[in-house]
Amino acid sequence: RGCPRILMRCKRDSDCLAGCVCQKNGYCG
């Protein structure tokens, strides 16, 4: 919830915008 719908690659939750977590597919969501 509250995660901007922007495709962002990540390795960890802190790579993502506020409200997002790093998913298993390597993208924030």
UniProtKB/Swiss-Prot annotation:
Localization in the cell: Secreted
Swiss-Prot/TrEMBL site (Reactive bond) positions: 5-6
Pfam families with a match to the protein in the record: Squash (PF00299)
InterPro entries: Prot_inh_squash, Proteinase_amylase_inhib_sf
Disulfide bonds listed in the record: 3-20, 10-22, 16-28
Cellular component GO terms, alphabetical: extracellular region
Superkingdom field: Eukaryota
A molecular-function term among this protein's GO annotations: serine-type endopeptidase inhibitor activity
Swiss-Prot/TrEMBL keywords: Disulfide bond, Knottin, Protease inhibitor, Secreted, Serine protease inhibitor
Ion transport among keywords: no
Family: Belongs to the protease inhibitor I7 (squash-type serine protease inhibitor) family.
Cited function: Inhibits trypsin.
Domains: entry comment: The presence of a 'disulfide through disulfide knot' structurally defines this protein as a knottin.
Protein name according to UniProt: Trypsin inhibitor 2
Species per Swiss-Prot/TrEMBL record: Bryonia dioica
